[in-house]
Amino acid sequence: MAEKVLVTGGAGYIGSHTVLELLEAGYSPMVIDNFHNAIRGGGSMPESLRRVQDLTGRSVEFEEMDILDQAALQRLFKKHSFMAVIHFAGLKAVGESVQKPLDYYRVNLTGTIQLLEIMRAHGVKNLVFSSSATVYGNPQYLPLDEAHPTGGCTNPYGKSKFFIEEMIRDLCQADKAWNAVLLRYFNPIGAHASGCIGEDPQGIPNNLMPYVSQVAIGRREVLNVFGNDYDTEDGTGVRDYIHVVDLAKGHIAALRKLKEQCGCRIYNLGTGTGYSVLQMVQAMEKASGKKIPYKVVARREGDVAACYANPSLALKELGWSAALGLDRMCEDLWRWQKQNPSGFGTQA
């Protein structure tokens, strides 16, 4: 019998790619999502997961649910026996978090506390949590390793991830039956090689690469580059971009780690290489064969100049490392964008 894994927020960008990898690895994923960042496909299924089913030839169990809905979560845990939970659900826009801090704390913190309480009540004490490199705040040194101080976060989104990390650490400390792997993501981009699933931001993209690809396809006129006066090679912000498929595979490695009764473990998921905004624009121009017009505007509140990972601990302890390079990230992103000019709303 395939081990059942609950995936919260599993219809979103990273979630759907992880569900696909779970299926390929022989797990049985059960997905809950509230459609905050997903588009409905046929019936009650999110379009992203409908396509995952098509790609894998396997079925995905799905229930529409909000992690703030305690009664629904209780029913779910009564009905199913989960080996582990992969927790993606939450709000995730840095800029919006500065504007709406209470929303971020309510959904991310309260939602996670409720989930952990229900997991505990049902004896499900294995967790993979999607954290973020934003917990490091302004880097004191680069590359960032897991020992770098956390908590100096520059926005409520990052703070919410930091608080959740601390809660999970305390929980594992208090009850040795808990095992948790906290994955600090750097900047996931790209799409599945089929071009059938990818990142489909609702409204104006907050992240660089979906915006760049929408400019390339003609959905948007010009890219805004937030600041060119940073202390970096070309003055634009530097980030560690990682292929979403590599990132998704990191979650499979994390599930394996839980089997070792690992307690609380924390890993960076990044490539170890930083690229600037303008380097990413050039890489996307190369992949798409399109010119990408841009204009420089003011810096964005809460953005740091440069941020990239030291991913060596994940290699050592999880046997995981990023395999797909920048060209591949951009080619896969462009294939997704070209095949789906309107994202998941594109009619086949």
From Swiss-Prot:
GO terms for molecular function: UDP-glucose 4-epimerase activity; UDP-N-acetylglucosamine 4-epimerase activity. InterPro entries: NAD(P)-bd_dom (IPR016040), NAD(P)-bd_dom_sf (IPR036291), UDP_G4E (IPR005886). Substrate binds at residues 132-134, 185-187, 206-208, 224-226, 239, 300-303. NAD(+) binds at residues 12-14, 33-37, 66-67, 88, 92, 161, 185. One of its GO terms (cellular component) is cytosol. Pfam families: GDP_Man_Dehyd (PF16363). Its cofactor is NAD(+). Keywords: Carbohydrate metabolism, Galactose metabolism, Isomerase, NAD. Its EC number is 5.1.3.2, 5.1.3.7. The active site is at 157 (proton acceptor). It catalyses: UDP-alpha-D-glucose = UDP-alpha-D-galactose; UDP-N-acetyl-alpha-D-glucosamine = UDP-N-acetyl-alpha-D-galactosamine. GO terms for biological process: galactose catabolic process via UDP-galactose, Leloir pathway. It comes from the Eukaryota. Pathway: Carbohydrate metabolism; galactose metabolism. Belongs to the NAD(P)-dependent epimerase/dehydratase family. Catalyzes two distinct but analogous reactions: the reversible epimerization of UDP-glucose to UDP-galactose and the reversible epimerization of UDP-N-acetylglucosamine to UDP-N-acetylgalactosamine. The reaction with UDP-Gal plays a critical role in the Leloir pathway of galactose catabolism in which galactose is converted to the glycolytic intermediate glucose 6-phosphate. It contributes to the catabolism of dietary galactose and enables the endogenous biosynthesis of both UDP-Gal and UDP-GalNAc when exogenous sources are limited. Homodimer. This is UDP-glucose 4-epimerase. It comes from Bos taurus (Bovine). The lineage of its organism: Eukaryota, Metazoa, Chordata, Craniata, Vertebrata.
